[in-house]
Design a protein with these regions (language model features):
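Helical catalytic core of nucleic-acid polymerases
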Residues: 35, 41-160
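Active-site palm subdomain of RNA-directed nucleic acid polymerases
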Residues: 172-195, 199
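Hydrophobic alpha-helix feature that most strongly marks membrane-spanning transmembrane helices
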Residues: 93, 117-118, 178-185, 204
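Catalytic palm active-site di-aspartate
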Residues: 59-61, 113, 189-204
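Short, flexible loop/turn elements at secondary-structure junctions
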Residues: 62-66, 169, 205
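Surface-exposed, low-hydrophobicity interaction/linker segments
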Residues: 158-159, 163-179
Length: 244
């Protein structure tokens, strides 16, 4: 469409560099400055124009990042399978919950979980496994959230849980990106960009042997070992899942 063409033209005529704003949000989630390449806001199908300097893009993100952060903050074990499927079986189809006729699938579980996480009034999760109050009492006092990364954010109690989880998840990813960047220091590969909870590596072919190590470093964060989704491709749109 004309709109798509104009949008793409605007991107290709603009800055080729990503200029992240580390202080753009109170939680620490990255934003970009107005003149930056719009990596965080561009349409997904425009990503095909983004190609690596080396041979591949390697993308890493956590499977159900914020759900896993909640479990980690409660010192609960991390399921070694897709977290939303795990929630279907262990939360939404558990005896204490099974009070509706419609079976809940993965997509439903995702919607229900985030509805519960961001709405303090929601009683949709009745399991003690996800204990909102325990997280709030540990990381919220004197009208402020205090995260494991030392962030102190003034916020009302209603939004405290979402701030704790968002900020902690964002910092987990940022901190791992820094460690991966150091790991790649004497190679041609480098951290290309971050998109929310995803770290993207510009990978040289000769560094392919490092992929399992990169995955391991990303997985083992400050809180626990999180399950990682791994994919690779020749541009930032066509990324295919890697099983490692």
């Amino acid at each position: 469409s004309t709109n798509n063409r104009l949008g793409l033209q605007k991107i290709t005529n603009g800055s080729k560099h990503i200029d992240y704003n580390l202080f753009g949000t109170v939680t620490g989630r990255l934003t970009t400055y107005p003149r930056s390449f719009p990596i965080l806001t561009m349409k997904k199908d425009f990503r095909r124009i983004i190609k690596p300097h080396n041979d591949w893009f390697l993308s890493l993100d956590y499977n159900g990042a914020e759900v896993r952060t909640v479990l980690a903050l409660l010192n609960r074990p991390q399921p070694e399978e897709d977290i939303h499927n795990w929630n279907v079986v262990n939360i939404f189809n558990s005896p204490e919950y099974r009070n509706q006729d419609i079976p809940i699938d993965r997509d439903d579980a995702k919607v229900l979980f985030f509805g519960w996480l961001y709405n303090p009034e929601s009683e949709v999760i009745k399991s003690n496994l996800y204990d909102r109050d325990a997280i709030i009492s540990k990381y919220y006092n004197d009208d402020s959230v205090n995260t494991v990364f030392g962030r102190n954010i003034k916020v009302d109690k209603r939004r405290a849980l979402s701030y704790i989880v968002q900020s902690t998840t964002s910092d987990l990813v940022l901190e791992r990106a820094i460690v991966i960047s150091k790991l790649l220091e004497n190679t041609n590969s480098f951290v290309s960009h971050l998109v929310h909870d995803e770290v993207v590596i510009d990978l040289a072919d000769e560094d392919r042997h490092m992929v399992p190590k990169i995955k391991e470093v990303f997985s083992n964060n400050k809180l626990d070992k999180f399950m990682v989704n791994l994919s690779a491709g020749k541009n930032f749109y066509n990324l295919e899942e890697l099983k490692l």
